[in-house]
Amino acid sequence: YNEAMRRLSLFIALSVLVASHLAQASETNSGHAMTMYDTEPVKYGENFSHFDYLNPNAPKGGGIRLGAVGTFDSFNTFIAKGNAAGTGSVETLITSSADEPFTVYGLIAASFEWPNDRSWVIFNLRSQARWHDGTPVTADDVVWSFDTLMEKGAPGYRYYYSAVESAEKLGEHRVRFNFKEAGNRELPLIMGQLPVLPKHYWADRDFTETTLEPPLGSGPYRIKEFEAGRYIVQERVPDYWGKNLAVNRGMNNLDTIRTDYYRDATSIRLALKAGDIDLRSENQSKAWAEDYNVEAVEKGLLKKEMVPHQMPTGMQGFVFNTRRGIFKDPQVREALGYAFDFEWSNRTLFNGQYTRTASYFSN
């Protein structure tokens, strides 16, 4: 009798545990935003008007001229072939806020659904989303984009989405991604970053080939003119479907964005000082210290400014091949680190622009 009762009690306890686990796994969350962890607070509520760091009344107009190193022979950025130039015409299902660690809000998607175990995610698309030719963006486009990138896209897509079992159309504006395993908390957010491409546009075009035909997109900009390998001019789409979304309010203010291509960074610096481009983000300490001592800076015509930020900057250091006997001893590696004269290098080679790396997560 005691043995039977013990087994019955154990069976009941296991049943309750399994039922509790299944209930927790099947519990569905939904909302206008999604975070890495469901316990994280969302800064912007369902009816927010704009991101705090943007000016919703920012004036629109004008243009900017930028410089890029290299060249281009294609606008198909989704394959390995060719040297493609990106455009502002492709959108994703979600967009991230810049003042939260990893919280996403809907762009093409209006809302999301996901279980506690994150074994799948559903995106409910905005019915007003449109391609530049006026055709609605639908679940067919999302499913086709995923399947095509997995089958014909650059190899990186197959690796990036390798944990996804399938993309499934649930309705005209509703799509679900099923995952091979539960528990990957980032995967639903990753799928929101899927570039959404127009199925009808590619129906009679070869996705695996390079092309200089300006692509059809749904985003705030489209290509106005270009010269292969030389420059691209993008224009703001006046009737862009998403211009009044809260996530876009205060953004996409320029009428035109021109990008000129140069042989190297030195050529871009010369173009900036000559007034041929408007902006450059400098990443070389020597150039920052020495290359901008020009009259235009002294007169205030060219502004040189260091912009504080709180973004992790990564780390720099020595990487040792510990398969070699000489580097297997931790004390040897530590001694080589001490032997490196950081202060002299920083003063002599880097114009005093660097600080010591104290963490893998600097800044």
Regions found by a protein language model. Give the residues of each.
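Surface-exposed binding/hinge segments that line
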Residues: N124, R158-A203, P220-E227
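Bacterial N-terminal signal peptides that target proteins for export
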Residues: N2-F11
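Aromatic- and charge-enriched surface segment that lines or borders ligand/interaction sites
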Residues: L54-P59, I79-A84, S111-P155, L170, ...
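Bacterial N-terminal signal peptides
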Residues: F11-S20
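N-terminal lobe/hinge region of extracytoplasmic solute-binding protein
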Residues: E27-D117, N124, D147, P214-L216
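Short, well-ordered beta-strand elements
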Residues: A33-T35, G61-G70, A110, W120-I122, ...
